[in-house]
Regions:
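Active-site acidic/histidine proton-transfer and metal-coordination neighborhood
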Residues: 16-17, 56, 73-177, 189
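Glycine-rich, proline-tolerant flexible connector loops at the mouths of alpha/beta enzymes
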Residues: 32-55, 114-118
Length: 274
């Protein structure tokens, strides 16, 4: 298991600026935000320049994060389950562009939101809408050799392991998989360590942050909340995962280097104990 850090904590920096900073902390990987001010629009990113910087600073790309769309509206919108088809199309095309960027960058994964916020529609009708979009997207993902990772989150159409497992049964492709956010499952009042085993057939990448005992969805520096990371890491090791666990601390925009360093120190110590 390797540690990466998400560039979404560095929104006051350019992507070119945060690459060396993340490397200097000690991380071996970076998750690239596919939104302003980093890889947006995805088609406009200077791939040659970014690949050169990554090589210079010995960083791998853990994942392309296409979850938020502040460039167009906000964290969740346009979502996969909008009533207006043209808005769903914006999300679809953005994710396709991120898949293409992943191929050009040599990254294997693009993560996306778990459907979107619930609307005044029946739950099943929103599920059917999301399923249709994912099955259509999967054909492009397969052509490009990139896996799209759904990320369940509190308050979205998919927020728990039960939601994900029920939904994935209707997906026709192995190129739609899971971005396992440890904090999100904890917020859903599930044991993340148990969920690693339960969802192991679908996991391709992990997000990591801590959460307070209240289980309110507010990302904290690992070690400052109540998640038992030792048990989660043991489960990940038992599962045989060799990829990156990406620390995601976007609330720390004012001091991402401090937050990243504190997280790295804490997590590195835990890994030495496993």
């Amino acid at each position: 298991m390797k540690l990466a850090f998400s560039s979404n904590a560095f929104k006051k920096f350019s992507l070119e600026q945060c690459i060396p900073l993340i490397s200097q902390i000690g991380y071996s990987g970076i998750e690239i935000l596919c939104d302003v001010p980093h890889a947006y629009p995805p088609k406009d990113l200077d791939v040659i320049k970014i690949r050169s910087l990554l090589s210079e600073h010995n960083l791998e790309i853990s994942n392309l994060n296409s979850f938020t769309l502040y460039a167009i509206r906000d964290t969740y919108h346009p979502s996969w389950v909008e009533d207006i088809s043209s808005l769903r199309h914006i999300r679809f095309e953005h994710t396709k562009n991120c898949i293409e960027l992943a191929r050009r960058l040599g990254c294997k994964f693009v993560s996306t939101e778990g459907g979107g916020p619930l609307l005044k529609k029946s739950y099943q009708s929103l599920r059917r809408r999301f399923k249709k979009e994912m099955n259509a997207l999967s054909r492009y993902a397969e052509d490009q050799g990139i896996k799209v990772l759904i990320e369940p989150e509190p308050g979205l159409l998919l927020e728990s392991s039960r939601d994900f497992l029920s939904f994935i049964k209707g997906i026709e492709s192995e190129y739609i998989r899971l971005n396992f956010d440890i904090a999100h499952f904890y917020c859903a009042r599930e044991d993340p360590a148990e969920m690693v085993h339960r969802l192991s057939d679908f996991i391709e990448h992990f997000h990591l942050s801590d959460i307070a005992t209240s289980r309110i969805h507010n990302h904290l520096i690992p070690g400052e909340g109540s998640i038992d990371f030792k048990s989660v890491f043991r489960a990940i090791v038992e599962f045989g995962y060799k990829g990156h666990v990406t620390v995601e601390l976007y609330p720390y925009q004012n001091n991402p280097v401090f937050a990243g360093a504190r997280a790295f120190e804490f997590l590195r110590g835990l890994l030495l104990e496993i």
